[in-house]
């Protein structure tokens, strides 16, 4: 295992690995312990009491964070006719149909999110083996397969983030940048937490929010007191 650098070691010394912090404390500490020379992302990890092998316990969705993510998302929209014009007017970076399918097949990935109208999914679905592993396949659960392309594009541009529980039941998501005021990050954190709480499967028994941690890009992990997020 590679040894962590000096900056990381110094940052890690500011974090008490035996302590559970309040949400506010953890986020302030995450900002203080960022070790990189760019505006790092602030990320959270919720370990949930779910079994994703069960169909009714697979958690996936999207939420618009009130203060955005600080990241500019490049949006590609697959649509036809008037929907192309709507997507363009809403601020989509790329709009089209078959020509972009051909470009993707040739290795083009200069975008972050795909939105598609339902009538385009027959064609877009053929890209499953290319888009699926990259997490780029549009999905109705995240609002990226829709006839309302205007709303979809505007929400993504406003700071919409997708979330999905991994095999271990962990949901990772970025809630902003180190440059954000701490209270803005706390507000984004609470918005995501509330959405995850509402998404709790009825069949999930026992503790739902098992562990919660916050970190920055390449920064140390900071544990949050689970009692602060449990309903």
Swiss-Prot record:
An annotated Gene Ontology molecular function: structural constituent of ribosome
Subunit structure: Part of the 50S ribosomal subunit.
Descriptive protein name: Large ribosomal subunit protein uL1
Gene Ontology CC terms, in alphabetical order: large ribosomal subunit
Gene (UniProt): rplA
GO process annotations (BP): regulation of translation; translation
Family assignment from sequence similarity: Belongs to the universal ribosomal protein uL1 family.
CDD domains: Ribosomal_L1 (cd00403)
HAMAP family, alphabetized: Ribosomal_uL1_B
UniProt keyword list: Repressor, Ribonucleoprotein, Ribosomal protein, RNA-binding, rRNA-binding, Translation regulation, tRNA-binding
Gene source species: Macrococcus caseolyticus (strain JCSC5402) (Macrococcoides caseolyticum)
Function noted in UniProt: Binds directly to 23S rRNA. The L1 stalk is quite mobile in the ribosome, and is involved in E site tRNA release. Protein L1 is also a translational repressor protein, it controls the translation of the L11 operon by binding to its mRNA.
